[in-house]
Amino acid sequence: MINRKQGCIINISSIWGEIGASCECLYSITKAGVDALTKSLAKELGPSNIRVNSIAPGIINTRMNNHLSDEEKEDIKEDIPLEKIGEPEDIAKCVEWLIEDNYTTGQVISINGGWSI
């Protein structure tokens, strides 16, 4: 990418990197580290026209969350302003946008239905 003077790196972090999760300290710390890495690399690689961004999903309807009971999912939805759990397509649309865009770098984009506000 550096030799070609162009590129796009998209990291995946998590809402827990921003707000922290009880009983998930290590997970939260590593996701916050991904966000810091994203910003640092954006500064370092920007002169080579390489954009670096991160997507921080909230609760998304994936296998990772299959362990949640229906009751737990309903409790979570109550804390989300859009009152729903995200779908993988929500993340995919953001990835597509970041690939096509040519001026966004160093950003951590939260896709969580407003949960982090």
Task: List PLM regions with ranges.
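Short, flexible catalytic-loop segment of classical short-chain dehydrogenase/reductase
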Residues: E18, V52, A56-H67
